[in-house]
Amino acid sequence: FKEQVNAETNEIEKYKDITKKYVSEAHLVLYVMNSTNPIKESHREDLEWLFKTLNLLPRTVFVLSRFDEVADVEDEKEFNSAFDVKKQNVVSRLTDILGLDSASRACLSVVAVAANPFDMGIEHWLSNMDTFRLLSHIDSLQTATAEKIKNNGGLESIANETKRTIIREILTKQLPVDIDTTKQLEAEV
């Protein structure tokens, strides 16, 4: 990861740390994945942090991106078949990594989109919106995000849960440091 200097503290931050800060404060998470190999073993630590430590799973939509690379987006039957296989793969990998129970699996939201079908470019798709909506399946993402908001009690409820997530993140980082400091002070006294 590249480094960046924090203007306030003049400390060097890694982009991953910056990203983690913003994600921990997110109201809703769109977890965008490569459709070819959606959830890699190398992502285990980040997945555990996101969904166990921060408890963001109920507020996450998993997005299989560039789905036109793994399925014919013009053939609805093929698209749905490939999506079912990839969705099962995502659910299975998340279950293995996070130890999800059946209730958690049932609440998972997975969609597949092709944001730029056939790499035709934004200019083309802006002048062909109906075809874009049909081929991109972007409506499924819009529906999934609206359902996540509704299923989590609406915007105010999600904002309150975000506050709890931020507190949980602070406690996860700071509490062990404070306990160590207290132990050191007790040992000195």
What are the functions of these language-model segments?
Residues 121, 130-189:
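Extended helical scaffolds that flank P-loop GTPase cores
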